[in-house]
């Protein structure tokens, strides 16, 4: 996965919150759906996820128990320093948030525990 695509425009209006609506669908505060397209694991320590904003027909919301175990958290919340804090209290770095030909992608990377 490239560190930052060279084509496209940077997006600065990041979602304040992303929470799991159903399996493989996250919803932001504006009711936009984000789908985790790629999950990358390196050396068991580095986890990255590429999220794409898509128009999808939403099913019924699911509880964490219904969603089941996942490498990804149930929720992310944007902090003032530009990082996301997840429901398990870990921090994720926003590597990039871009729009190419109307398609919006966001790459998040799990930060190591301090």
From Swiss-Prot:
Coiled coil: none annotated. GO terms for cellular component: cytosol; endoplasmic reticulum; nucleoplasm; nucleus. The keyword Cell cycle does not apply. This is T-cell leukemia/lymphoma protein 1A. Belongs to the TCL1 family. It comes from the Eukaryota. Keywords: Chromosomal rearrangement, Cytoplasm, Endoplasmic reticulum, Microsome, Nucleus, Proto-oncogene. Restricted in the T-cell lineage to immature thymocytes and activated peripheral lymphocytes. Preferentially expressed early in T- and B-lymphocyte differentiation. The gene is TCL1A. It comes from Homo sapiens (Human). Homodimer. Interacts with AKT1, AKT2 and AKT3 (via PH domain). Interacts with PNPT1; the interaction has no effect on PNPT1 exonuclease activity. PANTHER family: PROTEIN P13 MTCP-1, T-CELL LEUKEMIA_LYMPHOMA PROTEIN 1A.
């Amino acid at each position: 996965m490239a560190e930052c695509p060279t084509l496209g425009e940077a997006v600065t209006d990041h979602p304040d919150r992303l929470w799991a609506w159903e399996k493989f669908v996250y919803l932001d505060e504006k009711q936009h759906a984000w789908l985790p397209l790629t999950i990358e694991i390196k050396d068991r320590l580095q986890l990255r996820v590429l999220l794409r904003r898509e128009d999808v027909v939403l099913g019924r919301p699911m509880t964490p128990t219904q969603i089941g175990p996942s490498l990804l958290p149930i929720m992310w919340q944007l902090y003032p320093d530009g990082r996301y804090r997840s429901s398990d209290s870990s921090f994720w770095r926003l590597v990039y948030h871009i729009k190419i030909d109307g398609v919006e992608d966001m790459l998040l990377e799990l930060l190591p525990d301090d």
